[in-house]
Each structure stands twice: as structure tokens, then as C-alpha cells.
Curated annotation (Swiss-Prot):
The active site is at E321. It catalyses: 5,6-dimethylbenzimidazole + nicotinate beta-D-ribonucleotide = alpha-ribazole 5'-phosphate + nicotinate + H(+). The keyword Glycosyltransferase applies. GO terms for biological process: cobalamin biosynthetic process. This is Nicotinate-nucleotide--dimethylbenzimidazole phosphoribosyltransferase. GO terms for molecular function: nicotinate-nucleotide-dimethylbenzimidazole phosphoribosyltransferase activity. InterPro entries: Nict_dMeBzImd_PRibTrfase, Nict_dMeBzImd_PRibTrfase_bact, Nict_dMeBzImd_PRibTrfase_N, Nict_dMeBzImd_PRibTrfase_sf. Disulfide bonds: none annotated. NCBIfam families: cobT_DBIPRT, PRK00105.1. Its EC number is 2.4.2.21. Keywords: Cobalamin biosynthesis, Glycosyltransferase, Transferase. PANTHER family: NICOTINATE-NUCLEOTIDE--DIMETHYLBENZIMIDAZOLE PHOSPHORIBOSYLTRANSFERASE.
Length: 362
């Protein structure tokens, strides 16, 4: 069967790397500011990275949004989560009420949210939740493929379409979030296959499991990989067999952001697994990714290591939802504010600056 995926193929063709010439100009300005070279650390790197993304040395964020993909996972049948599956729909409904972690933090930093039903097992009633349902949850990947290849492509393209739409509406900074009971299991499976690392090293306790439950989760993830035998060279095959609609949709968001040349933030382990998928499809995606925090889930370090990213925050967070994105939005806007408004050495009347050495780590 021939699968139509024109949007995905076009998107992958259009993703180009960051502008190296503008990056050089941005570093030249950053290093001319009235401070020891490198003294603003990660803030300097963020500002310069965004210059390379946009093609402009000075940048401002006009509108920012976290896209939250909500979906259920059939592997919950294996008892891989301490939470009931019905919680996915409830979380989605609470997101739009702005009473969850991501809702409160987004409001605090004046960021918008788009809550998407991409595969919740039930029909949610709140009209503020965008209905992009591919199916009523995935199948139990410990027994069969989680979804068809067609469904995987549809979910990925949903993410691309949403970013395309929001860029046209003026959004120029994106975050990624999710809700999906059991999705730390699917994320661990995807990361294990794409990074070729034993799943036992990647599976974490998620929302909290007993020691017995943790062992069972490891078993279920390993069984899913062994039964489905996903092809590590084919990201769509990996997502279809052992992934989730949320992972696929977020992967599409990363691809869409890279195509549209806007920065996009990784939250925790689920969006990190989706980022790894996007990176494996087109390595240029890396230039548009900003890793918000080092999740307490063990798999995150394998992802950031594989892509070559350094999480900005180390706060022992593991909530998910996209909760790291609003925190990172504030850091990004702070970095751009410094680049745009800080005085240069000359403007600050620091004529003899030879004493200011480069203190960056080599």
C-alpha cells in the first residue's frame, strides 16, 4: 500500500540548518557587550542560537505557545502506570481550565496553550480542546503494533499542520507538552530502539510505581520491542510499532518549527523522545531545539547526548505536561533582552577592555 505523506516529505525537504554567517555576527555583538566574555553562560548561547534560526542578530518574541498532545496508550493494559487511564481525558480538560502546572505557569509568563486530542480513548466535551483524534488510543504494543503506519504519518502531519497554522497567526516561539497515561513506557521504548540502548536503562518510574510495578514496566517495554521488531532506520516504523499518537504529534511539531524557522522547546522525556524522532528524520532539526530541563527520568540524558543538546535547567522536575516550557520561555526572552539592550563596551565607556578575558569553557 502506498501511503500518501506529501506534507511530511515536503517538510523534511524544506528543513535547512541555522545561518552560520548570522551566528558569527551574533557572537561578535554578544562578545562586544559590557561584560566578561562568556559570563552570561547559557543565555549567550540561547540568544545566538535564535539569531541563527531567524537570520537576524536582534530578535523579539511576539507570541508564544505550548502545543499539548493528549493521547491514550494501549500498553496501559499491562499495568505500566500507577494512574488510571481515565486521567488522560481529565488532564486535558483541566489544562484548558489553566489549573494544572502547565496552565498556571503559562499564564504567569503570558504564553498560550493549544490542547489537542490526538488520540484520547474517550470523547472529551470541552470545545476548547482541539479535536484531531487519529484513533481512540493506541493498541497494546506489548502484543501488537501500537498503530498503523498510516496513523503514524497522520499524527506526525497533524503536528506539522498545527505549527504551520500558528506561525501564520504570528506565533514565533513554541513549546511541547502532553498528557497520556503510559507514555513514559512508549517513550522509553522509542528511545531504546533509536539510541540502541537497553530499555532497562531507560525505563523510569514515571508517575510513581512500586518496585514490583517498575519491574513489570521494564518487562512490558522489552516485550513490546521484541514482539514488534521495529526498524531503527525507519522512524515512522518505530513510532507505529512502539510509540504513541502524542509522540508522533509532537515529532511533527518539531519538524514544523524547523521548517518554519522558529525555535521550539523540549520539555521532559516524552517530548524528548519525539525530538529524537524528528532529529533522526532530519538532523538539521537540532538547530531549532532548545532543551528546557534535565528531567528526572533516566532516558533524557541518552536523548540529549544523542542529539547534542544541553538542558538549561536542573530542577529534578518530572511532571510532564510541558511544564518546563514556560520556564524556558522566560529564559529565552531574557536572553534576547540582553542581546538587544545591553550596552557595548564602547557605549559603556570601557575603553581599555584587555583585562576582560574569555571565560567560556573550551
Amino acid at each position: 500500500m502506498v501511503i500518501i505523506m506529501k506534507l511530511l516529505e515536503e517538510t523534511l525537504r524544506r528543513i535547512k540548518p541555522a545561518d552560520e554567517e548570522v551566528i558569527k555576527k551574533a557572537w561578535s555583538r554578544m562578545d562586544s557587550l559590557s561584560k566578561p566574555i562568556g559570563s552570561l553562560g547559557k543565555l549567550e548561547e540561547i540568544a545566538v542560537q535564535i539569531s541563527g534560526i531567524t537570520g537576524k542578530v536582534k530578535n523579539e518574541i511576539n507570541k508564544k505557545m505550548t502545543v499539548i498532545m493528549c493521547s491514550d496508550n494501549g500498553i496501559c493494559e499491562e499495568g505500566v502506570s500507577a494512574c488510571p487511564q481515565e486521567l488522560t481525558a481529565l488532564l486535558a480538560e483541566n489544562y484548558v481550565k489553566e489549573i494544572t502546572g502547565i496552565g498556571v505557569l503559562s499564564k504567569h509568563v503570558n504564553a498560550d496553550m493549544c490542547v489537542v486530542d490526538i488520540g484520547i480513548k474517550s470523547d472529551v466535551k470541552d470545545s476548547r480542546i482541539l479535536n484531531k483524534k487519529v484513533a481512540y488510543g493506541t493498541k497494546n504494543m506489548a502484543k501488537e503494533p501500537a498503530m498503523t503506519r498510516e496513523e503514524a504519518v497522520k499524527a506526525i502531519e497533524t503536528g506539522i499542520e498545527l505549527v504551520d497554522k500558528f506561525v501564520k497567526e504570528g506565533y514565533d516561539l513554541f513549546g511541547t507538552g502532553e498528557a497520556g497515561i503510559g507514555n513514559t513506557a512508549t517513550s522509553a521504548a522509542v528511545i531504546s530502539v533509536l539510541s540502541q540502548i537497553d530499555s532497562d536503562k531507560i525505563v523510569g518510574k514515571g508517575s510513581g510505581l512500586t518496585d514490583e510495578g517498575f519491574l513489570n514496566k521494564k518487562r512490558a517495554v522489552k516485550q513490546a520491542i521484541e514482539i514488534n521488531k521495529p526498524n531503527k532506520e525507519d522512524v515512522i516504523d518505530v513510532i507505529a510499532k512502539i510509540g504513541g499518537f502524542d509522540i508522533a504529534g509532537i515529532c511533527g511539531c518539531f519538524l514544523g518549527a524547523a521548517k518554519n524557522r522558529v525555535p521550539i522547546v523540549i520539555d521532559g522525556i516524552i517530548s524528548a523522545s519525539a525530538a529524537l524522532c524528528a532529529y533522526k528524520m532530519n538532523a538539521n532539526v537540532k538547530d531549532f531545539l532548545i532543551s528546557s530541563h534535565l528531567s528526572a527520568e533516566p532516558g533524557i540524558e541518552y536523548v540529549t547526548g544523542a542529539i547534542g543538546l544541553k538542558p538549561c535547567l536542573h530542577m529534578e522536575m518530572r511532571l510532564g505536561e510541558g511544564s518546563g516550557c514556560p520556564l524556558q520561555f522566560f529564559m529565552i526572552e531574557s536572553a534576547l533582552c540582553l542581546m538587544n539592550n545591553m550596552a557595548t563596551l564602547a557605549e559603556a565607556s570601557i575603553v581599555d577592555s584587555e583585562f576582560l578575558v574569555d571565560i567560556r569553557e573550551k
